[in-house]
Amino acid sequence: AEQQSVALPRLLTNDVSRFTFHESPSAGQLIRQRRSAVSFDGKTSIASATFFQMLGRVMPAAELPQLDRPMPWDVLPWEPAIHLLLFVHRVDGLTPGLYVLVRDREKLPLLQQSMNEELIWTPVSGCPDSLPLYWLLEGDAKKAAVQVSCHQEIAGDSAFSLGMIAGFEGRLREGGAWWYPRLFWEAGLLGQVLYLEAEAAGVRGTGIGCFFDDPVHEIVGIKNLAVQSLYHFTIGGPVEDG
């Protein structure tokens, strides 16, 4: 079957040892130089290998006991709840469109059942086998990314942006209201890892705290509270302050 196209929302009309990570400055240097981008140049692309490498760093190796997981995922005493809905704009070798990174393979059925049943979950060609990355929709996703991000151009001028999609209702029903802030702790840790990975790759990231969650859900057909969009992030070539 042919891949579907990205539709605009109705809005205002693992095994990380299998990855070869790039050589980079020391962790201390990256942490000290880490900044949030205020705008992107709308033209910088990143290599698919760099993209896969970044995604590899956010994989928590959920199949392992907590203390055997790669840093920093060994600090979270629960199974990963958040997965990434990726708006890919400028990644060399990847077709622009929407993708999903499933951070815990056991949650793939939950995600598939929570989204439009007509979506085709196509494993990404050339992606490491240990990275559960799926291509959902083909097409220019820049306008959709900008619209759902409160019309912020940073979501479309980047190399890619993403929404952090969390298993929601089931977690809260099973664990109680205390689960809600913990979902954001996990989202925050994801954001910090992405910030440092962007710096290591010679680009820059920034969080997107303003977004329209219902239109995000609409793009992939999320119709209930089983999963919810909690936070957004974007990475690309920064425009430096003068």
Give the positions of each predicted feature.
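Acidic, surface-exposed loops and disordered segments
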Residues: 1-242
